[in-house]
Amino acid sequence: MNAVAALPTPTIHTTCAQDIHDIELPQWLEDCLQQWQREIEQGQDETTAPHCLICRAFCFAYDLHAQQRRKSGEPYIAHPVAVAGLLRDLGGDEAMIAAGFLHDVVEDTDISIEQIEALFGEETASLVEGVTKLSKFNFSSTTEHQAENFRRMFLAMAKDIRVIVVKLADRLHNMRTLDALSPEKQRRIARETKDIFAPLANRLGIWRFKWELEDLSFKYLEPDSYRKIQSLVVEKRGDRESRLETVKDMLRFRLRDEGIEHFELQGRPKHLYGIYYKMTSQDKAFEEIYDIAALRIIVESKGECYRALSVVHDVFKPIPGRFKDYIGLPKPNRYQSLHTTVLGLTSRPLEIQIRTEEMHHVAEYGIAAHWKYKESGGSENATLTSTDEKFTWLRQLLDWQSDLKDAQEYVENLKQNLFDDDVYVFTPKGEVISLARGATPVDFAYRIHTEVGHHMKGARVNGQWLGVDTRLKNGDIVEIVTQKNSHPSLDWLNFVVTPSARHRIRQWFKRSRRDENILRGRELLEKELGKTGLEALLKSEPMQKTAERCNYQNVEDLLAGLGYGEITSNSVVNRLRENNVNNVKNSQSSQEVTLASSPQVHPPTPPATGKDNSPIAGIEGLLYHIAGCCHPLPGEPIMGVVTRGARGISIHRQGCHNLEQMDGDRLIPVRWNPNTNNHQTYPVDIVIEAIDRVGVLKDILSRLSDNHINVRNADVKTHLGRPAIISLKIDIHDYQQLLGIMAKIKNMSDVMDLRRVISG
């Protein structure tokens, strides 16, 4: 960025502080302006005095916004002053604070970026330009525009991460003053804040911004729920604070007895949106949310963190499965702390966090606690390259974003992988791998290396053979077993969650099976449009234009992309409609195809014979049985094995360890028949760990009965001071039903863990 000589350089009135009467300045800014005035009076150059950049930026913004008012009626300058103050509180450098004052100047006045650069330097101008561009993005627009706006935002962040921090401060103050807008605008801005900016603040570790953005969004999106929860929190505050003070007194004595002299005990109230999220996602009442109030212990060293943890577990009984060590395994945003949940007073669960002062600073201020440019004085240190470790998530987004042609899929993957929490698993050598929550061994394999994923045969998780679609949990040790003649399955696309794995699987099918993919693409398009006139449509000029609009050179490439899942048939049909194609006539046959207002849905043809009614497709007329080692369910990837004897085909889950023992020529591809009306059930073994109390088994069985799940067998094992182990054999129709009932049981307040038991 270079200054343009032809543009006039505006004048900065250095005496502006003496003329301010319409707003009350914060004390820090008053002190800064007074010091700057003294330096000028003592003969220093106004452009080189120690406080010049911040003060000159304020005076410049004050003059430009002097005649402007916000919707609330207050002077407009109050907003830039508030934004600059938020950035100062985060520890931002002078360029950031100056950008806070100037961030609306280019958009709302006649001043150009070149003039900003001439007055305040390239670094400040670059930040102002970045924020100005972000302000023009509409994240609630059409999917294609939304995807492009996301891409531009991440590129701006990669160039200088401070741009998005200034934007977050701008958004936070706008949310604080949202009352002056119409209800419709309030909801639109609140939705965008909740979906985009609060998760970004979380990824950057700026907890102070994150919780307030979430609570303010909640206030405008769900006003009735917000007021109700706010009232309940206030109503119970006295009891909570009394219990916390008693707990503090108990711990204060024991910590000193342990030799930990310097520490701080803080109450940590749960924020309103966090309470609402738990109530809705876990189907719990307000009274069942045990961590509405929590305790934080701040000590001086990492060693004292673990000593303090020992004290806590001596004083209060820890609840098994509720301990997390984020010191040994930090979050991607560099958050570190020990989390434990104990049975506190009156046997109510109490969450306790333990961290050092430095860890606490990082937890509150996030990336602001790590900015290296403050030490070196160079802006280039704020870029992505020098802080790779802290921004692996952003680097991954930049790596794969250009590979996805389908805008809708890009936005969905983005929201899942940027805004969801991560899960941390280990390689057999102890290396930590961070994956999106819900990731499977297939996602893990492709994270290790593309070829590991391509030749994956199965996976051992914690030493046990599990299905390749198993959802990984924190702390799992994952080992991928490969075989030279193994290759990806299209079924993997149904359960992988990371964009990199999804893209590499599709690339493999794109390269290796082009003819099959074209045929499959035709079939998918035929389902959307109907068979009549399809040939004419595929040869038409509008179809060629549609292929080009979808970034393919020709229709065959588009069909291949459909076949291996790079783009969806729904997206293709939508592009056709955008081209205003209503009918395409076949000149030879006079047949026509019509693009309906919505995609055609063809109901499945009822099976004509008993053979067609088989749950398994691909072995019609053959004897088969469901393998007892792995108990596959409809909806799970399966493989057939030709048995030695008269038992016919044995149906196994893909990834079953018994498949490893089989000769390759005995394996045959099979799949579940989606058209069957055979509603049989299949046995599934699950193990539940629950708090040992009277009636816990009854409550679990009632939950199963309410969902029409038959229980074949139940067994309970208890040991004093340990959770109850409940083993159940239940009848399940398909994999989706299993996932649904497991989620409902996990949400029960007494349930600590639940897993499916598979021997194969």
Curated annotation (Swiss-Prot):
Residues 685-759 form the ACT domain. Residues 585-614 are annotated as: Disordered. Transmembrane segments: none annotated. It catalyses: guanosine 3',5'-bis(diphosphate) + H2O = GDP + diphosphate + H(+). Residues 76-175 form the HD domain. Pathway: Purine metabolism; ppGpp biosynthesis; ppGpp from GDP: step 1/1. Keywords: Hydrolase, Manganese. Its EC number is 3.1.7.2. SUPFAM superfamilies: ACT-like (SSF55021), HD-domain/PDEase-like (SSF109604), Nucleotidyltransferase (SSF81301), TGS-like (SSF81271). GO terms for molecular function: guanosine-3',5'-bis(diphosphate) 3'-diphosphatase activity. Residues 421-482 form the TGS domain. Its cofactor is Mn(2+). GO terms for biological process: guanosine tetraphosphate biosynthetic process. Belongs to the RelA/SpoT family. In eubacteria ppGpp (guanosine 3'-diphosphate 5'-diphosphate) is a mediator of the stringent response that coordinates a variety of cellular activities in response to changes in nutritional abundance. This enzyme catalyzes the degradation of ppGpp into GDP. It may also be capable of catalyzing the synthesis of ppGpp. PANTHER family: GTP PYROPHOSPHOKINASE, GUANOSINE-3',5'-BIS DIPHOSPHATE 3'-PYROPHOSPHOHYDROLASE. This is Probable guanosine-3',5'-bis(diphosphate) 3'-pyrophosphohydrolase. It comes from Synechocystis sp. (strain ATCC 27184 / PCC 6803 / Kazusa).
